[in-house]
Amino acid sequence: MQLSFIESCFHAFKDQSALVHNLTNDVAHNTVANVLLACRASPAMVHDIQEAPDFVCLSDALAINIGTLTQTRLNSMLATAKMAHSKGIPWVLDPVAVGATAFRQQACRQLLSLQPDVIRGNASEILALAGMSSQSRGIDSGDSVAAAHAAAEALTQYAKVVVVTGEIDWVTDGMNRWAINHGHPMMTQVTAIGCALTALIAGFVGANKKAMAQAAVTALCYYGQAAEHAMQIAQGPGSFYIHFLDSLYALQATDVSQQARVTLYE
C-alpha cells in the first residue's frame, strides 16, 4: 500500500506553520497551545463573538470543541464556523459528550448545518452525533471504534472526513477508509490530549486542503507515534506529558512514514 502521502502531508503542515484558531474548552487551552507549538504550529484562542469571526479570516484552520459549552460560546462558535465556511477555511468539529444532554445535541445539529470539513470524536460521540444508540458516560466512550464505523459513514453527508478515535483510529471520507494502529493508553490519563489532537488535525487539513483525509491520517500517525515514543521513557502521566511534547517536537516526516501502521480499506 502506498503511504507516500504521509511525508508530503507532514512537510506541507510543517512548512506552513499553520495558525490554528481554537474555540476550545476551558480545561484544554494550555495543552492545545503547547501541543501546537511543539508541532511548529501557531495556536490562537479568540472566543468572543465580537472578534472571533473576524480573527478566523486570518487563520489557516478552525477547531471547535464543545467541551465546556455555554449559550454565549455556542453563539460565537456558530458565527465563527459560518465565517470560516464562507471563506473556505477548513474547520473541525469535536462534539464532546454530544449524547449527554439535549443542549449539546441541539448545538451540534446547528454546527453540522455549517458543514465542518472534519468531525473528530470517540466512538460514542460519533454514534450519538449520527443519532444512533451509544453507551457513553460523559466524555468517556463506552463503545468500540468498530461499532461506530456505520455512524462515521452516515456523517460523511455533513463533513468531508470523519475521524473516530480509540484503540484503533478510523478515518473515512465516504470512499476510502483507513485504520491507524498507533497510540498508548496513557493518552487517556492526561486531560485535553484528545482536544489537542482535534487542533492538530485542523492544522494538518488547513495545510492540505486537497487531501484532507490523508492529512487526518498523517496527523493520527504522528500523534500516536509521539505517544509511543514518550512511553519508552515516561513513568506516569506527568512525565508522559513532558516526553510527549518532546516527541512531537522531534519526530520527522521519514520517522512517521516509515513507522506508520495504517491499513487502507477501499
Swiss-Prot record:
InterPro entries, A to Z: Hyethyz_kinase (IPR000417), Ribokinase-like (IPR029056)
Q: Domain of life, per the record?
A: Bacteria
One record GO biological process: thiamine biosynthetic process
Which sites bind ATP? 120, 165
Q: Which family does it belong to?
A: Belongs to the Thz kinase family.
Q: Name one GO cellular component term.
A: cytosol
Entry-linked HAMAP family: Thz_kinase
Question: Per its Swiss-Prot or TrEMBL entry, what cofactor is needed?
Answer: Mg(2+)
Q: Does the keyword Magnesium apply?
A: yes
* The protein's annotated pathway: Cofactor biosynthesis; thiamine diphosphate biosynthesis; 4-methyl-5-(2-phosphoethyl)-thiazole from 5-(2-hydroxyethyl)-4-methylthiazole: step 1/1
This chain is encoded by the gene named thiM
A single Gene Ontology molecular function, please?
phosphomethylpyrimidine kinase activity
Q: What is this protein called?
A: Hydroxyethylthiazole kinase
